[in-house]
Amino acid sequence: MAVIKKPDLTDPVLRAKLAKGMGHNYYGEPAWPNDLLYMFPVVIFGSFACVIGLAVLDPAAVGEPANPFATPLEILPEWYFYPTFQLLRTVPNKLLGVLLMAAVPAGLLTVPFIENINKFQNPFRRPIATTVFLIGTFAAIWLGIGACLPIDISLTLGLF
């Protein structure tokens, strides 16, 4: 059972502060209208001006034009698809590859239920979920690096 500290509303000092309007946010200036009407537009327009200025002064290079008659030797997906691309590339059976791809989100869905009794936010107090996260992160990085290499050294990364 979690212990939650609640304010004692029978305390006369606290009741006097609440009567004067001094609750949890009685200091400083109010967010409405000062922040929402005056500061947010300045920040939004400033950010927009920075983005437009960078786009005008230093446009991103699109690259060479596409040539439909010359295809590269190996077509790679975007970088965030490298781990799943590596899974599909190294698993010999197509059905097993699809099942492994479906196992990734299924495994992520089970992580909160592994330690549902322990409600701590600190990862050091949740060793199972932290271990699952670290192993998954290491495997994703390993597979992502391996996807950029030729197929014969992709699993070992050329280290062994």
UniProtKB/Swiss-Prot annotation:
Keywords: Chloroplast, Electron transport, Membrane, Photosynthesis, Plastid, Thylakoid, Transmembrane, Transmembrane helix, Transport. Pfam families: Cytochrom_B_C. It comes from the Eukaryota. CDD domains: cytochrome_b_C. One of its GO terms (molecular function) is ubiquinol-cytochrome-c reductase activity. Its main location: plastid. It is found in: Plastid, Chloroplast thylakoid membrane. Component of the cytochrome b6-f complex, which mediates electron transfer between photosystem II (PSII) and photosystem I (PSI), cyclic electron flow around PSI, and state transitions. NCBIfam families: cytb6_f_IV (TIGR01156). This is Cytochrome b6-f complex subunit 4. The lineage of its organism: Eukaryota, Viridiplantae, Chlorophyta, Ulvophyceae, OUU clade. The gene is petD.
